[in-house]
Amino acid sequence: MKVKIKRLVGPEYMTGALRATAGKDMYVVKKPTMKTFKQMAVSAGGVPHSPLRAVLYRIYVEDVKSWVTVHYVRHHIGVQFYVKSQRDDRKNDPMVDRGAARQDTEISMMFDINANSLLTMAQARLCLKASPETRDVMKAIKHQLFEGDEYDEIVGNAMQPPCGWYEKCFEPQPCGKVKNRS
């Protein structure tokens, strides 16, 4: 599996959203301070603030099992997926019989996602109840963020399963890492 990340819209466009919510000049385009950006990503209770939605990433995932992509495309808020087609009319493709295609066939996907939605997705996909293969994809995404700048590192550090934020598990059958929901 190979993961690459490209930031399409940077944190400088978050400043206008921050200022709009405070009733200030929303036409300002400048990077927020690291402290402000971290407060937006790592707020109390693990819920990122809405201006973080202004930051947009394009994530490329290659050679991932088809069934793993299905786990990701379940997310639909703040994200747009582009997954390799299994259509029968793609004759130059070795996977021409859609009905015979195995779920473990390795395919590629790409998705555009805002930083807020990425943090929400990470909560579900880093949970120990997620399949190891699904967790591996999210871990690779998180690792790639650490290869970016300080802003990307903040997003990467904020990517945690729910038990990392709440110290409780909300799964019907928890893994046992923390106590179940009250």
Locations of regions flagged by a protein language model:
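Family-specific signature for flavin-dependent thymidylate synthase
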Residues: M1-S182
